[in-house]
């Protein structure tokens, strides 16, 4: 008997809700089994790296909010660290604690969206509704410090833009007290749910070797059982003073990646608690007048201060010639910024390393042999955002 099966080519996206952005995915299928998955990217390319070359170092910060727009402050953090490395400037301790505090709030902001939308893709609507309620509270904290719910533009080379408003630490403390029970509720719905496990266990497996070979990082790498976290291996700001664990998976499948993200939120809560308890008093920006604008009060009294403020925001400051690479443990993985300065007020080159770019490349090998419905599950656990992939 001859086998007369014929492969089908199927286009998914770029306007499909399950692709989490403008992903065009070309599937080569034998019946409903996937033989090849070919992702086409570039539909959200905005030339960010080139645009930054024509901006001062201060004007470049808002571009980082618009890369992975689900976790903006972590990307600002990477750029701020890179500029500080070239300037060799000291960041006040209070500013470092504020940065770490908001980086961990950003991690929760990212993971709640990922787990909620992943559950929705698989057919569970309740987790998304519950988690969006919690995300809204974090976005309010963003709004309190920066005036914006999403594109915060809050971190600065040398510190942060403004001090914490009165009462904000108490509000964050209340939030992290009531948040773990909400996570337990989500876990009670999903962890041992028969349908959830059938859709996630042994789907999209990436072995330790494959995860390393494809350049995975963050929960994608830790889900495969490799305990690599830049906050531990290459700590920045005050992460070396924080007590937390690095959760890892065993099998490298979709379920492990989901569970790693869930456990990471509990660790983020621990770090936020420590930041609130240890938060020192003091300055929130470096005292170098070349980097820090004068206060409003000084500008009302002194013409020189007014001129200084105007020059700082129009011309910016010169950064010594040199090159540096700084990376942070963003919620999706290692987000890195390579900066090359020729000594002027604008970067000669700014190369951005986005974790989602490497993760999307692995979609093909993780999808092979699975059903089409499983591809949607795998895309959800990759946690991709096209702002950072296409740049």
Curated annotation (Swiss-Prot):
Entry's transmembrane regions: none
InterPro entries named among the record's database cross-references: NADH_Q_OxRdtase_suD, NADH_UbQ_OxRdtase_49kDa_CS, NDH1_su_D/H, NiFe-Hase_large
Keyword GTP-binding: no
Species lineage: Bacteria, Pseudomonadati, Pseudomonadota, Alphaproteobacteria, Rickettsiales
Top-tier EC class: translocase
Catalytic activity: a quinone + NADH + 5 H(+)(in) = a quinol + NAD(+) + 4 H(+)(out)
Membrane-topology annotation of the record: Peripheral membrane protein
Location of the protein in the cell: Cell inner membrane
Family named by the database record: Belongs to the complex I 49 kDa subunit family.
Protein name according to UniProt: NADH-quinone oxidoreductase subunit D
GO CC terms of this entry: plasma membrane
Subunit structure: NDH-1 is composed of 14 different subunits. Subunits NuoB, C, D, E, F, and G constitute the peripheral sector of the complex.
């Amino acid at each position: 008997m001859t086998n007369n099966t014929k492969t089908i080519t199927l286009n998914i996206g770029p306007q499909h809700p399950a692709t989490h952005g403008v992903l065009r995915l070309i599937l080569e299928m034998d019946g409903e089994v996937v033989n090849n998955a070919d992702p086409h990217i570039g539909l959200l390319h905005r030339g960010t790296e080139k645009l930054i070359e024509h901006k001062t170092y201060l004007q470049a910060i808002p571009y980082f909010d618009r890369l992975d727009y689900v976790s903006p402050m972590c990307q600002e953090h990477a750029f701020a660290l890179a500029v500080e490395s070239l300037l060799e400037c000291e960041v006040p301790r209070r500013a470092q604690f504020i940065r770490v505090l908001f980086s961990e709030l950003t991690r929760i902001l990212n993971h709640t969206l990922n787990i909620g939308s992943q559950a929705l893709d698989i057919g569970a609507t309740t987790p998304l509704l519950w988690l969006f309620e919690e995300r809204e509270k974090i976005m309010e904290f963003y709004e309190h410090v920066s005036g914006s719910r999403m594109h915060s533009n809050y971190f600065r080379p040398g510190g942060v833009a403004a001090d914490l408003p009165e009462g904000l630490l108490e509000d964050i403390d209340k939030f992290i007290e009531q948040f773990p029970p909400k996570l337990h509720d989500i876990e009670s719905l999903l962890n041992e749910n028969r349908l959830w496990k059938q859709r996630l266990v042994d789907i999209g497996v990436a072995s330790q070797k494959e995860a390393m070979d494809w350049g995975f990082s963050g929960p994608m790498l830790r889900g495969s059982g490799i305990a690599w976290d830049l906050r531990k291996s290459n700590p920045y700001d005050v992460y070396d003073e924080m007590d937390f664990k690095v959760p890892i998976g065993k099998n490298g499948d979709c379920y492990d990646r989901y569970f790693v993200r869930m456990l990471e939120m509990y660790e983020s809560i621990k770090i936020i608690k420590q930041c609130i308890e240890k938060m020192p008093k003091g300055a929130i920006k470096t005292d170098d007048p070349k980097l820090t604008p004068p206060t409003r009060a000084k500008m009302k009294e002194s013409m020189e201060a007014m001129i200084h403020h105007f020059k700082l925001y129009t011309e910016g400051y010169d950064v010594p010639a040199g090159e540096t690479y700084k990376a942070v443990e963003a919620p999706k993985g290692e987000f890195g910024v390579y900066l090359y300065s020729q000594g002027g007020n604008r970067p000669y080159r700014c190369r951005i390393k986005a974790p989602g770019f490497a993760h999307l490349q692995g979609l093909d090998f993780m999808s092979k042999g699975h059903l089409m419905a499983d591809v949607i599950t795998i895309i959800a656990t990759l946690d991709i955002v096209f702002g950072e992939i296409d740049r």
